[in-house]
Amino acid sequence: LTDRDFTRALWQSATECPVVFPEGVGVCPWMVPGGADIAMATSELMKKYQAAIWAQHGLFASGPDFDITFGLAHTIEKSAEIYVKVLSMGGGLIRQTITDDDLRAIAHDFGVQLNEEFLD
């Protein structure tokens, strides 16, 4: 699972995602929780992102205050839930997503700069 693939799945699942985390979400591979290795890997991801997913463990999010950080975490969680539900109802297929052109239109209208590395 890559930062790009995970971010695209979230962005394509809920309209507010590209507005709330236009830089994307980092993905940390599975590591023993609570140790120095996961702390160092997370700190590297946080140089680029406001949030990092810990594979098979959880989410780390950072922001200027509690409300913004909680909103970020909630948006990621909600979008992931939508993605999982759509996959489970569609037999593993996703039949409709927010296109890259639509993502760019959202970014334009909300005045945010998307991470273009994550778009086709």
Language-model segments: residues:
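Glycine-rich flexible loops
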Residues: 1-120
